Amino acid sequence: MTAAQMRAARALISLSQSELAKRAGVSIPTVKRCESDSERVAAVSAETQDKIRVVLEAEGVEFTNGNHPGVRLRRP
């Protein structure tokens, strides 16, 4: 998951940084740090990245990692 994917995923489901932090059980500064990295969400542990990803995927976000990494909503 890239920082851009994380920002886009949040925007796609209209989730604030504070709400994502709360649901993932991490601090708001942690979410901000993840989203500010230019390439990858490498500023935090793999465990923290997984917590965030689980929340986003539970809301229907699907991460795409082809030639152009992105996000989309899963079809119901």
Q: Residue locations for each model-derived region?
A:
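Short basic helix-loop element that most often maps to the first helix and adjoining turn
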Residues: 6-19
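Residues in the recognition helix of alpha-helical DNA-binding motifs
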Residues: 9, 23, 34
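Residues in the helix-turn-helix
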Residues: 19, 30, 48
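Recognition helix of helix-turn-helix/homeodomain-like DNA-binding domains
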Residues: 26-44
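Helix-turn-helix/homeodomain-like alpha-helical modules used for DNA recognition
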Residues: 61-76
